[in-house]
A protein has these predicted regions:
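Cysteine-centered motifs
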Residues: 14-15
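Conserved ATP-binding subdomain of kinase catalytic cores across diverse folds
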Residues: 25-187
């Protein structure tokens, strides 16, 4: 029937769009694992993946690209949504780590099909640009090596307490912690 063919057409459009995104992300990942992709020319590039992101450690910098996924409680399936959530990640995380979260940078494709950070051409993706944290200064490492003394722990506690005292509360924020919302996001 006509309704069924419209639904099938929408499903086909959706699926082909997701396939195109995965292919595009494949070329982005391939390019971003090469040291010559980056303007600062790191010696090596390491790739780590989470369920929602590709994380490229490129010398002194880290680039995080969101995967085109939809888990219901978050939807990164369009370029516009990924840009929005990159900007939100930058805005939110700068509150605690302004010297670490540096920018949101576009990944571009030029007329020859070459990819670059910034530059000219068509924006095909966005990445959160961060300063790389020295491993020996990470709290997780300091704790594992029994080097997180009282002064370090007091400084962390004070920073977290200041953050929570200044954080917005009420209304929609309270609703996010409701049983109904939590159940919806986990079922």
């Amino acid at each position: 029937s006509k309704v069924l063919s419209n639904i099938d057409g929408q499903l086909l459009d959706c699926c082909s769009s997701l396939t195109e995104q995965r292919m595009s992300h494949s070329s982005i990942v391939e390019s971003m694992t090469r040291a010559d992709f980056y303007p600062h020319r790191p010696q090596t590039v390491e790739l780590f993946q989470t369920h929602i992101s590709y994380v490229f450690i490129a010398g002194d910098y880290v680039y995080k690209v969101k995967k085109p996924v939809n888990f219901g409680f978050l939807d990164f399936t369009t370029l516009e949504q990924r840009k929005f959530y990159c900007e939100e990640e930058l805005r939110l995380n700068r509150r605690l780590a302004p010297s670490i979260y540096l920018d949101v940078v576009p990944v571009m494709r030029d007329n020859s099909g070459n990819l670059s950070l910034g530059g000219t051409g068509q924006i095909i993706e966005y990445a959160v640009l961060m300063k790389r944290l020295p491993l020996d200064k990470m709290l997780k490492i300091l704790l594992a090596q029994n080097q997180a003394d009282k002064n370090i722990m007091d400084a962390v506690a004070e920073k977290v307490a200041r953050f929570h005292r200044a954080a917005e509360t009420g209304g929609k924020i309270d609703q996010m912690g409701s049983i109904k919302t939590i159940r919806h996001n986990t079922d």
